[in-house]
């Protein structure tokens, strides 16, 4: 059923209809459209368009339709309706006859779809927040189990300083906490209702839009009708949240892909999140992580695409804005799937402590400790930095770690070096000295775990 037609003397070309129709993707807004219609029917009673009995009939029919949709949402796709609004109205008329034609009084699809999409976004943000916190919890639990797993930390993908696997996990907890904060902020700005703004200039009926907003679970109504039907900031903001969140998950995936590689060998992934090769029997591929990394690009693309769609649009509504949904749905579905998959990857991961420790003892990751030792002996840091660089060259020449160089060799570079240097160069000393807030010392890591557990109510 089309919601327009009196102005036209020819039927739409079937090719145009297929090009124009949006039901194939906006069917996902069915529940929100029905809920919004129930609230609108109540508002129409307050301005005398509907009687209380008429509203009751409409609400009962809409609630029946809501249950039918929840039981079988795919039924919607069997229709040739233009969009979800047409489908809902058509089904309502089937149930209550001519009365159903009164529901759209004072309402436009412009404010209707803006409301539907905001309601959907609010629900989806809550799902994302739950999944985000579940992944944070999984990381904290993994950190707690691996506080003593010493491994190399990297800069430029070269061994830099020793850290722990727990400290690595907690780095991603921080990223996810920022993602959580962004979603919470987005939810605040989402929480205003555009319903009652009409096509662009507002409704001609004296509806209490604040009351209407409250019925729909919004904290308030929007302030400007022209902006309300044109606004897709919440789409851009959610896509931005998703883009940043997926960058974090992609980096998480890349780290673990490397840690899982034969070259690093720091972790082994569970069979449940890996796959094999059709040719090479020995292969155990980190497909879950590679897909997380790969899916990051499609989310970035959705954000860029939506920005380009909106950048040249005049006020108010334009059909271009129909393009707001497919990219958003796909991006948020993808982000949600990847959050769940990342948590699954951590469930069953094995950290190979001996291999991690061996790697941490290689690559001269304790060079900074030697520089700090020299500073404590009164050597200016820049000079100490140069001295240690020369000592590393000598250690490489001898094929030894720094702590294995004889004292006489170390003293060639600085006479202030004494026997007390060797305890300083141990891995444990390297960790213990990083005791400022946020550092890798065991005490700081334990504190960070406790803080995260308290925040997440674990």
From Swiss-Prot:
GO molecular function: argininosuccinate lyase activity
Keyword Amino-acid biosynthesis among record annotations: yes
InterPro entries: Arg_succ_lyase_C, Argininosuccinate_lyase, Fumarase/histidase_N, Fumarate_lyase_CS, Fumarate_lyase_fam, Fumarate_lyase_N, L-Aspartase-like
GO biological process, one term: L-arginine biosynthetic process
Secretion signal, residue range per the UniProt entry: none
EC class name: lyase
Gene3D superfamilies assigned: Fumarase/aspartase (C-terminal domain), Fumarase/aspartase (Central domain), Fumarase/aspartase (N-terminal domain)
Pfam family, one: ASL_C2
Keyword Glycosyltransferase annotated: no
GO CC annotation: cytosol
Catalytic activity: 2-(N(omega)-L-arginino)succinate = fumarate + L-arginine
Subcellular location: Cytoplasm
Keywords attached to this entry: Amino-acid biosynthesis, Arginine biosynthesis, Cytoplasm, Lyase
Enzyme Commission number: 4.3.2.1
Pathway it works in: Amino-acid biosynthesis; L-arginine biosynthesis; L-arginine from L-ornithine and carbamoyl phosphate: step 3/3
Coiled coil regions in record: none
Family per record: Belongs to the lyase 1 family. Argininosuccinate lyase subfamily.
Designated name of the protein: Argininosuccinate lyase
């Amino acid at each position: 059923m089309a919601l327009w037609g009196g102005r036209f003397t020819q039927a739409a070309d079937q090719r145009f209809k297929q090009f124009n129709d949006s039901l194939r993707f906006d069917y996902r807004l069915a529940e929100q459209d029905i809920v919004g219609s129930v609230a609108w029917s109540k508002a129409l009673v307050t301005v005398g368009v509907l009687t209380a009995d008429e509203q009751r009939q409409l609400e009962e029919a809409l609630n029946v339709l809501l249950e039918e949709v929840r039981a079988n949402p795919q039924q919607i796709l069997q229709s040739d309706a233009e969009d979800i609004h047409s489908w809902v109205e058509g089904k309502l008329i089937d149930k209550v006859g001519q009365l159903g034609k009164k529901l759209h009084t004072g309402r436009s699809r412009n404010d209707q779809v803006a409301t539907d999409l905001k309601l959907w976004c609010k629900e989806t943000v809550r799902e994302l927040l739950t999944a985000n916190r579940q992944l944070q919890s999984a990381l904290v639990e993994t950190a707690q189990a691996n506080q003593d797993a010493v491994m190399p930390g990297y800069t430029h993908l070269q061994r830099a300083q020793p850290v722990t696997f727990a400290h690595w996990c907690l780095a991603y907890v921080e990223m996810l906490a920022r993602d959580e904060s962004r979603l919470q902020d987005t939810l605040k700005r989402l929480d205003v209702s555009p319903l009652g703004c009409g096509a662009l200039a507002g409704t001609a009926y004296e509806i209490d839009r604040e009351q209407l907003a409250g019925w729909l679970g919004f904290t308030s109504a929007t302030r400007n009708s022209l902006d309300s039907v044109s606004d897709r900031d919440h789409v851009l903001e959610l896509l931005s949240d998703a883009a940043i969140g997926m960058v974090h998950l992609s980096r998480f995936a890349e780290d673990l892909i490397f840690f899982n590689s034969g070259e690093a060998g720091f972790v082994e992934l569970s069979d449940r999140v890996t796959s094999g090769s059709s040719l090479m029997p020995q292969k155990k591929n980190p497909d879950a992580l590679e897909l997380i990394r790969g899916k990051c690009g499609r989310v970035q693309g959705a954000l860029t695409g939506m920005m380009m769609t909106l950048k040249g649009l005049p006020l108010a509504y334009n059909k271009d804005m129909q393009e707001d949904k497919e990219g958003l749905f796909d991006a948020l579905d993808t982000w949600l799937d990847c959050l769940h998959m990342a948590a699954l990857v951590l469930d069953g991961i094995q950290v190979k402590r001996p291999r991690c420790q061996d790697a941490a003892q290689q690559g001269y990751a304790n060079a900074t400790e030697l520089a700090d030792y020299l500073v404590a002996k009164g050597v200016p840091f820049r000079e100490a930095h140069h001295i240690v660089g020369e000592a590393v060259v000598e250690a490489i020449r001898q094929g030894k770690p720094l702590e294995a160089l004889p004292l006489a060799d170390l003293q060639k570079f600085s006479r202030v070096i004494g026997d007390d240097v060797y305890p300083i160069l141990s891995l444990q000393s390297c960790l213990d000295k990083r005791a400022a807030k946020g550092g890798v010392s065991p005490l700081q890591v334990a504190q960070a775990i406790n803080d995260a557990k308290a925040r997440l109510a674990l």
